[in-house]
Curated annotation (Swiss-Prot):
Record note on cofactor: Binds 2 Zn(2+) ions per monomer.
Quaternary structure and partners: Homodimer.
Pfam families for this protein: DnaJ, DnaJ_C, DnaJ_CXXCXGXG
Protein name, entry field: Chaperone protein DnaJ
Record-level GO BP terms: chaperone cofactor-dependent protein refolding; DNA replication; protein refolding; response to heat
Gene: dnaJ
Length: 366
């Protein structure tokens, strides 16, 4: 089943402000919260609302979603925490009296996402490229297989929090006794303690290493876009899945080509004679040189379209065009004969063929 549009999920317009999106999210999250809602598919709807908010609350993710739809939003952007800054715990706290639901400290958790910057030449971005990148990651320790405990030993349940990862702290206040729950400092909230630590990773369960990863850059990618490589981020916690790697692409400027989405733009200088009398010229494209007929009387700023000579759409939706913008170069070092002909040209209102012929031969050195 295809995903619903994120704006439709939250019930907001595509021009909605951040505050409108946040209000819609809070309202729907409260409505479909599994602990409150009695609707049969409340869990699925709650997850759908969470996913929509995660994308639309982030400016970069939202811009990419607006451009590419669900295919673009799945690529992600940035490193570290990719959440929208207002998650499940915020909702639970604001709606249900400030006390967040206790999570299993030993439950599997996904590893952190990583970001890698890569710079491509203009043509490499047009045609795509396969790269082998080397990134620093934290992988599970091979010695203890990620447990952090010395081989042959096991973790023990924390005696201070009885494996809950939290301890209760009582406080007497003018309003009575208040019990607060805090993260257990003895086990750092894991609920387990390592009596004999692994000597390789010193009890962390992870080791820092450099990993080589093959990344396929799709043809037509543009400056600032990114590729998501699933499962190539940091190792998961407690057996959870690894995070993702996001490769952010930067494209070097070209000497005379410019990108405008899938289209390529270049400026074509023409001599006075070529522009006035017409000519056939060779135009460079990323696909090779092509011949272009310039009609007589072409002016600076005139634009010619070379169909299919642009960049391929990164999502596979066709091919862009190349636009050639004319710039007429006014001659600066004229011979006496050329000056004489131009004066004759300026003085004649009827620009007859014989004068055009003289001008053409003069400017071509014939």
């Amino acid at each position: 089943m295809s995903k619903r549009d994120y704006y439709e999920v939250l019930g907001v317009s595509k021009s909605a402000s951040k505050d409108e999106i946040k209000k819609a999210y809070r309202r729907l999250a409260k409505k479909y919260h599994p602990d409150v809602s009695k609707e049969e598919n409340a869990v699925e709807k709650f997850k759908e609302v969470q996913e929509a908010y995660e994308v639309l609350s982030d400016e970069q993710k939202r811009a990419q979603y607006d451009q590419f739809g669900h295919a673009g939003s799945s690529q992600g952007f940035g490193g570290g925490d990719f959440g929208g800054g207002f998650g499940f715990e915020d909702i639970f706290s604001s709606f249900f009296g400030g006390g967040s639901r206790r999570r299993d400290p030993n439950a599997p958790r996904q590893g952190a996402d990583l970001q890698y910057q890569v710079t491509l030449e203009f043509e490499e971005a047009i045609f795509g490229k396969e790269l082998n990148v080397e990134i620093p990651v934290e992988d599970p320790c091979d010695t203890c297989h990620g447990s952090g405990a010395k081989p042959g030993t096991t973790k023990e349940t924390c005696k201070y929090c009885s494996g809950t990862g939290q301890i209760s702290v009582e406080q007497n206040t003018p309003f009575g006794r208040i019990v607060n729950r805090q993260t257990c400092r003895h086990c750092s909230g894991t609920g387990q303690m390592i009596k004999e630590k692994c000597t390789t990773c010193h009890g962390t369960g992870k080791v820092r290493k450099r990993k080589k990863i093959n990344v396929k850059i799709p043809a037509g990618i543009d400056n600032g876009q990114q590729i998501r490589v699933a499962g190539k981020g940091e190792a998961g916690v407690n057996g959870g899945p690894a995070g993702d790697l996001y490769v952010v692409v930067h494209v070097r400027e070209h000497e005379f080509f410019e990108r405008d989405g899938d289209h390529i733009i270049c400026e074509m200088p023409l001599t006075f004679a070529q522009a006035a009398l017409g000519a056939e010229v060779e135009v460079p494209t990323v696909h090779g040189k092509v011949k272009l007929k310039i009609p007589a009387g072409t002016q600076t700023g005139t634009e010619f379209r070379l169909k299919g000579k642009g960049a391929p759409n990164v999502r596979g939706y066709g091919q862009g065009d190349q636009y050639v913008v004319v710039r007429v170069v006014v001659p600066t070092n004229l011979t006496a004969h050329q000056k004489e002909l131009l004066r004759e040209f300026a003085g004649q209102e009827d620009k007859d063929d014989s004068l055009f012929g003289k001008l053409k031969r003069a400017f071509k050195g014939e």
